[in-house]
């Protein structure tokens, strides 16, 4: 998919989408900070951009209103719901994003019901050579969190970054990033601290690195992370490494995850440039 443009006014965005539908071109709207217009068939990109230029000259032209009447969407196509916060959560997160969030919450509840150690025996990185073929352990450590702040912080970033990746690049891409970063960040962390660790932060740092570099090198991907946030991520790594806050942090997982995300973004953007 290709992002064509963004509109601050959702009604204007809907008018353009409706008009293009009457011309046989299917566009979709994704609501984020603005109304982003996406085109599935990239072979029609030049035609859409030419129509967009004409539309921007006079968006109030009667033919655009007529197109909205024809499609039955003169109300901008938006639904004003009683729970906008929940709607925002749902709109930004795809099935993989939600599945991981639910898994983390369920595991957190289990840890509070039966105790951290009991759950860690089930899900932790292999802590005995006899467990090395229990392959789920190389990934399930990401679901364990040890405080309310720990899980809230990680899930907020996971929803913000993972949801964007899934919505823009697909569930498959998010799965690949998650699996690779969980495996490699876990491997590095167990070298630092042993097998008794947990949390989604290694994957979150991979997503930070991926989204930031992908946005810098491939703006057309539609994902980005403000430079101030990537600087915050780096400062947080430094703070954890120097133990400024007296908190136990998975520093190895953070660094490994960030490197994994940057490397994957570099490879993906390199391949994208070769194709063009």
Swiss-Prot record:
EC number assigned by the record: 3.4.21.105
Name the residues that span the membrane: 94-114, 142-162, 169-189, 192-212, 229-249, 250-270
**Subcellular locations according to the entry:** Cell inner membrane
Locate the coiled-coil region(s) and give their ranges: none
Query: Known catalysed reaction(s)?
Result: Cleaves type-1 transmembrane domains using a catalytic dyad composed of serine and histidine that are contributed by different transmembrane domains
Recorded GO CC terms: plasma membrane
- Active-site annotation: 201 (nucleophile), 254
Biological processes per GO annotation: proteolysis
The UniProt entry, under InterPro entries, shows:
GlpG_N_sf, Peptidase_S54_GlpG_N, Peptidase_S54_rhomboid_dom, Rhomboid-like_sf, Rhomboid_protease_GlpG
Q: Which Gene3D superfamilies match?
A: 3.30.70.2350, Rhomboid-like
The main location is: membrane
**Keywords, comma-separated and alphabetical:** Cell inner membrane, Cell membrane, Hydrolase, Membrane, Protease, Serine protease, Transmembrane, Transmembrane helix
Give the bilayer topology: Multi-pass membrane protein
The terms under GO molecular function for this entry are:
serine-type endopeptidase activity
Q: What does this protein do?
A: Rhomboid-type serine protease that catalyzes intramembrane proteolysis.
* PANTHER family noted in UniProt: RHOMBOID PROTEASE GLPG (PTHR43066:SF26), RHOMBOID-RELATED PROTEIN (PTHR43066)
**HAMAP family on file:** Rhomboid_GlpG
Protein name, as recorded = Rhomboid protease GlpG
**Which source organism does the UniProt entry give?**
Salmonella arizonae (strain ATCC BAA-731 / CDC346-86 / RSK2980)
The lineage, from the top, is: Bacteria, Pseudomonadati, Pseudomonadota, Gammaproteobacteria, Enterobacterales
């Amino acid at each position: 998919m290709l992002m064509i443009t963004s509109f601050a006014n959702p009604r204007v965005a809907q008018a353009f989408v409706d008009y293009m539908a009457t011309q046989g071109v299917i566009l979709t709207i994704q609501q984020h900070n603005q109304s982003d217009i996406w085109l599935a068939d990239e072979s029609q990109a030049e035609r859409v951009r030419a129509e967009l230029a004409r539309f921007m000259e006079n968006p109030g032209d009667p033919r655009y209103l007529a197109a909205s009447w024809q499609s039955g969407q003169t109300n901008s196509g938006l639904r004003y719901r009683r729970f906008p916060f929940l709607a925002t959560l749902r709109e930004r997160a795809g099935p993989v994003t939600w599945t991981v969030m639910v898994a983390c919450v369920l595991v957190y509840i289990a840890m509070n019901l039966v105790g951290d150690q009991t759950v860690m025996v089930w899900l932790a990185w292999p802590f005995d050579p006899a467990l090395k073929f229990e392959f789920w352990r190389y990934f399930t450590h990401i679901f364990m969190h040890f405080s309310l702040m720990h899980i809230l912080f990680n899930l907020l970033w996971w929803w913000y970054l993972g949801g964007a990746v899934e919505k823009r690049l697909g569930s498959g891409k998010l799965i690949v990033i998650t699996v690779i970063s969980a495996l490699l960040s876990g491997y590095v962390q167990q070298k630092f601290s042993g097998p008794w660790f947990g949390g989604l932060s290694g994957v979150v740092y991979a997503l930070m690195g991926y989204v930031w570099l992908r946005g810098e090198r491939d703006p057309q991907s539609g994902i980005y992370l403000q430079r101030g946030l990537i600087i915050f991520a780096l400062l947080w790594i430094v703070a954890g490494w120097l133990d400024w806050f007296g908190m136990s942090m998975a520093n190895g997982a953070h660094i490994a995850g960030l490197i994994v995300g940057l490397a994957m973004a570099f490879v993906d953007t390199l391949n994208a440039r070769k194709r063009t």
